Amino acid sequence: MTNLFKKTFIILIISFMSLKSAHTNDKVTLLLDWFINPDHGPVIIASEKGIFKDAGLEIEIIPPANPADPPKLVAAGKADIAISYQPQLHMQIHEGLPVTRVGTLVATPLNCLLVLEDGPIKTLSDLKNKKIGYSISGMEQALLSAILKKAKVNKDEVEYVNVNWSLSPSLMSRQVDAVIGAYRNFELNQMKIEGVKGRCFYIEEEGVPPYDELIFIVNNKNINKDMLTKFLDSIEKATQYIINHPDETWKIFSNYSKELNNELNEMAWYDTIPRFALRPAALDKRRYTRFEDFLYEEGLIDKKYSFEKMAIEIY
């Protein structure tokens, strides 16, 4: 009888420990690419609606002190997931960072060439002998090079002006005639709020191959497929909920922090929704190969890697 009691007690303890283990959430550190904004909608909604929690995840969402840090911190094993950009991912891998793309957040470019609607640029050929502002050298100049090439304008026939992050202000003050690197869901709306009409030339229509604007990256030496499957499934559910309930989710998002509840973010919210990846875990291999070819042709990389070096499918 004593032995039977002991066996029963042991079985109960094991069952309790298994049940407790099954209900222990995976703690995950997610580094954002920038301060929280509508581009991060699915992440915030998955958190606020309890979607992450239901999947067994405890996500710590951290905006970076320096936007250049998240990929480096993931590479160093100091964070589990980071949000980054496909164009920068190519460069990071060529620099030797052990990172890879595991999912997509925003599936179209947001970058555009922004001009004043009543300004001198009516067609891209009008860029000849004009001033073009930029904030990041290298990548943005490569994008601009492709745009100019399609417009049959020699890149030596334009003047490049580093305006740092003052993109729309430098355009509105007519310090420059156009800016590259402006986000179509933000700077265009910022100008509208200030009573200035702008116009975007969409780079994917003007010679630049389409790419994923925002992606999820991890350290390629430490890929937790179970955790990432739960994470990407949660992002997919949150994205579907946003698309089905845009007004409700705007209220949820804007209540996440009082700084988010403003006119610019509300306008950007609705402009960003069509850009979210409906299948975050899906991988367009050709998209990564094609952009690698583009960077090679523009001279930003000296050799080409296959897509397997840059991106994987978790399931």
Predicted segments with their positions:
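Bacterial N-terminal signal peptides that target proteins for export
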Residues: 1-9
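Hydrophobic h-region of N-terminal signal peptides that target proteins for export
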Residues: 13-22
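Short, glycine-/small- and polar/acidic-enriched structural segments
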Residues: 27-163, 168-173, 177-185, 200-201, ...
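Periplasmic-binding protein-like
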Residues: 39, 105-115, 196-220, 232, ...
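Short helix-capping segments at alpha-helix termini
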Residues: 51-54, 150-155, 194-196, 226, ...
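Pocket-lining segment of extracytoplasmic ligand-binding domains
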Residues: 87, 166-256
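Secondary-structure end/capping motifs
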Residues: 224-300
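C-terminal solvent-exposed extensions
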Residues: 292-315
